[in-house]
Amino acid sequence: MSYGDGEQPPVSETPEPKDDTNNPVFNLPPLLVGILAALLVAYVVPAYLLSEDGSNWFIFTFGFIPLRYAVPFSQQGLEWLWTPVSYSFLHGGIEHILFNGLWLMAFGAPVLRRIGTLRFVLLWCISAAVSAFGHAALNWGDVTVLIGAS
């Protein structure tokens, strides 16, 4: 194509590259930062701050135990209400919480951004409860404690 009479070819302007010097290394949604903090607190408190009896109480109170659903609710405390979700915040060791946290950052952040805060919280709670009750169905009446979402 020729350009006559002093016409110039169209010039495409390329945008200047953005200055990336102020971007954070981890750009995690606030809810995910809060969940990671809760996971850390739920690990540090029984592992390092409580006595052995206190740690056992913490795990028993917030861990999922299938036996709770084989015994009438009138014969026990209210732990059966929150343990289908609270167990997912507990971890058995530093490696357990470290790898779960890394996977949560890698895969949880895009899911959270895609589906939003409310749906993410519902996804967490429903999937934790379904997993817990699946465990209970396979281990009905068992006294072992289920901890961790992995």
Please name every model-derived segment:
Residues 1-40:
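C-terminal transmembrane module of polytopic alpha-helical membrane proteins
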